[in-house]
Every structure is written in C-alpha cells, then in structure tokens.
C-alpha cells in the first residue's frame, strides 16, 4: 500500500471519528433507549427483529442528524465557550457546508425510514427533529431561557414515537412517559447550565441561572424532578409493571428526589454534579426496567 493510500485511510477514519463525536453518541444513545423502551412498553411482539432494527436505525439517524445540525447552527456560540471551543464545528476542523450536508442526509434518511415503517411513527420522529433543530436551536435558544421546554418536547418524542409504533396510536401511557422525559430534561440540563453559567454568559445564551438566579433554578429542578418521578411511576403502573419493578422504580425516583431536595436546601458543586450524573443513570435505569419487565 502506498503512503498516499495509507494517508487517505487515516484521514477517512479521522473524519468518521469527528462526525461520530458530533452525533453526541451517549446522548443520542440514551434517547434511542427511550424509543426502544417506549416500543416494548406496548407489549407488542418485541422479537420482531425487522421492526426493532427499523426503529433503531430510523431513530438513531434522525437523532444523530438533528444533533449534527444543531452543532452546525451553534458553531459560532460554541467557539465562545471554553467547554465547546474544541468541537470540530467551532474549531474549523471540518467544512461547515459538509457538516450541514451530513446533518441533512442523516435526518432525511432517518425520517424517511420512519415514515416508510408507519405514518404516525414517522410524523412523531419528524416532530422531534423539527422541535429540536428549528424551534429550540434556531428560534429560541438565543432568545429565552425557556427554550429548554421546547428542547424537552423534542427529547420526549422518541419514547412517544416508539410506543405509538407498537400500538398504532397515541395513548395516555405514551403521553405520560413523554411527560416523564419532558420533566426530567430540566433536571438534567439546568444542573449543567449552573455548572457552566459563565460559558453561557460569554456566548450571550440566556439560561435560568443568568435570567432568574440560582435560587429559582434550584427550585425549578426540584419541581421538575418531582413531576418526572411521579410521571414515570404512574406510567409504570399503567403499563402493568409488576410490584417488584414498581418498587425498584420508586427507589430510583426517591434517589432523584433526595438529590433535588439537597440541591435546593444544601447546594454545592458536589451535589450539583451528582444530580447531573444521577439524572442520566435514573432515566437509563427506568428504561431498562420497562424493557426487562415486558420481556
């Protein structure tokens, strides 16, 4: 193999790695897990591997595509924040027009597969992408701290879409699961915005801490945590979870509530970071419980 050929392979692998990082694989993976859990919560034939594969591919591509498009749109403000300055989009490591094309291609293929599988499922997947890219990132993120609500709606769509795919319609359990995600997202994102408050201020991005103060932000986290835990337990009961699984979900929810109370009355960097990490563990564990219970 010639030196130029070897260099080409290395460059190709490097670019693939860059684009993989732009999809935020951990975040995208968590949202994908909610979609799969939503589908399985419908107690449909979960071992229909064709449907599961289609759901996995369509959701991941749509989520990854929207994330790449967000990176493309936010490249100017990312360049002003210390934690995001080294992203490929903000550092100029990749061509911005190429990033746009990749984001659009991933999004179109993902939504296209979803629509081909089921019209309602495809509509919900598209709605999640639209709320994330257009409503949240392009329209509201630089204008209001309440943009996280609309970002939360986007994050709630995968689980609603997954359950709708399994049932063929939207029911109250699917809506409750989606509300659990919607209320969980402020717990996750507001702790993050508190930690990086100066970064967001440098980029002139309005956040709850900069707009309403830390006290109101902590109170919002506490309220959203209570609502998220309540919604998940109610949805679990509606699904028909065994009492053993419900008790486990209750224990997980109690942990979330304890940290939310701690950050309200005894705030510290340690508690803030602990809640940020636990929020992700809580949601992933809740989704795993749903999947295990119905199998």
Residue ranges with predicted function:
Residues 1-16:
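Short, basic, low-complexity termini and linkers enriched in Ser/Thr/Gly/Pro
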Residues 33-37, 41-75, 82-83, 107, ...:
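Membrane-embedded alpha-helical segments that form the functional core of polytopic membrane enzymes
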Residues 101-144, 221-278:
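Transmembrane helix-loop-helix
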Residues 22-41, 156:
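The first (N-terminal) embedded transmembrane alpha-helix
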